A protein has these predicted regions:
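Cytochrome P450
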Residues: 1-214
Length: 214
């Protein structure tokens, strides 16, 4: 962050480092907390989405075949996986004024729960919403990271990590098969896959190279 103050760039860290409050640059403890928040926000969703995508690849083998045949689908596949997995289950908000949304009246100070997973499978937005479709033309319209001013700070990091991870994984292990064993941590906020048992197959497609937990 100190470097971004001396050598500003066109990125988020520079924006934070150069921000001012009451005419003064933000204190160091705020800067440290900000970049740590970005890293953790991007890492947690990435881990759960990575495991969830591997599970989807086993459940929808025809989609896995499409990606293996055309790796350029990986970025859109990552968006579609985020839609299907919805790593953050919900978020709570407080209405700051009386409002009406789609016919539903919302009073000032009323608490609301936003169910991202439900929105991401809205059939009016995503036809055949329960299908994992790596070619879906509006996959990026998902709300896995929220929306507007409260959109997750780690969204870009998470997307970059997913894309790079699957480029490497599919290059080394073209066939990854979920064994059906998994451990879901009890968590009301995030879709926490703490363990996913898989078989990794090398390019020869003969036998599992190793059994791993993702």
């Amino acid at each position: 962050m100190a470097d971004r103050r001396l050598n500003p760039r066109a990125d988020l860290l520079t924006t934070i480092a150069q921000s001012k409050l009451n005419g003064e640059l933000l204190p160091q403890e705020f800067l440290d907390g900000s970049w740590l928040l970005i890293i953790f926000a991007g890492n947690d969703t990435s881990r759960n989405s990575l495991s969830g995508t591997i599970r989807l690849m086993t459940q929808f083998p025809e989609q896995r075949a499409l990606v293996l045949e055309d790796p350029s689908l990986i970025p859109n596949m990552s968006e579609e996986a985020l839609r299907m997995v919805s790593p953050v289950i919900h978020m709570r908000r407080t209405a700051i004024q009386d409002s009406e949304l789609n016919g539903q009246r919302i009073a000032e100070d009323e608490k609301l729960v936003l169910w991202y997973g439900a929105a991401n499978r809205d059939p009016e937005v995503f036809p055949n919403p329960d299908k994992f479709d790596v070619s879906r033309d509006n996959a990026e319209k998902h709300l896995a990271f929220g929306h507007g001013v409260h959109k997750c700070l780690g969204s870009r990091i998470a997307k970059m990590q997913l894309r790079m991870a699957f480029e490497r994984i599919f290059d080394r292990f073209p066939q990854i098969v979920w064994t059906g064993k998994q451990t879901i941590s009890p968590n009301a906020l995030v879709h926490a896959i703490s363990s996913l048992r898989v078989n990794l197959y090398g390019p020869n497609k003969k036998r599992p190279v190793i059994v791993q937990n993702l």
